[in-house]
């Protein structure tokens, strides 16, 4: 940081992917928007990892979720984290369950697959939604 002071930081998670066979690009899950003010010292370093858009699918199947965005003090102390939005499959309207939230647990999503917390997402395939059969 060039000066000691209070810095306002805003992070936005990436949008989820979509299916090109529909209007999914309009209705894909949106990333969370998080912001806060942090006291940082002159010479201190922060690192920023920007989440990438979720994978786009061309065969009318589920697409990948968006990546989270992370701002870290030094090499390992998180300041702010914004989760990415969920990917959608053949959507013709918005499903708010696919949008990221400010909470620490994952959301259920549109097809009722379990939202995860602490690395515990869906455990079994359901109607091809996990890329398994």
Predicted features along the sequence, with ranges:
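Extended extracellular/luminal ectodomain segments enriched in beta-structured repeat modules
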Residues: 1-8, 41-45
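Short, surface-exposed beta-strand/strand-loop-strand elements in extracellular ectodomains
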Residues: 18-32
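Secretome/extracellular-domain signature
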Residues: 28-133
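C-terminal reverse transcriptase regions that engage the nucleic-acid substrate
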Residues: 15
């Amino acid at each position: 940081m060039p000066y000691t002071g209070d810095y306002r930081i805003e992070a936005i998670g990436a949008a989820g992917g979509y299916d090109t066979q529909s209007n999914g690009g309009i209705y894909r899950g949106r990333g969370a928007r998080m912001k806060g003010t942090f006291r940082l010292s002159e010479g201190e370093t922060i690192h920023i990892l920007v989440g990438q858009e979720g994978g786009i699918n061309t065969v009318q199947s589920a697409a990948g979720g968006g990546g989270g965005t992370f701002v870290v003090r030094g090499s390992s102390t998180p300041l702010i984290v914004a989760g990415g939005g969920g990917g959608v499959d053949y959507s013709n309207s918005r499903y708010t369950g696919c949008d990221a939230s400010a909470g620490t647990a994952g959301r259920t999503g549109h097809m009722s697959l379990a939202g995860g917390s602490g690395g515990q997402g869906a455990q079994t395939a359901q109607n091809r939604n996990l890329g398994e059969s």
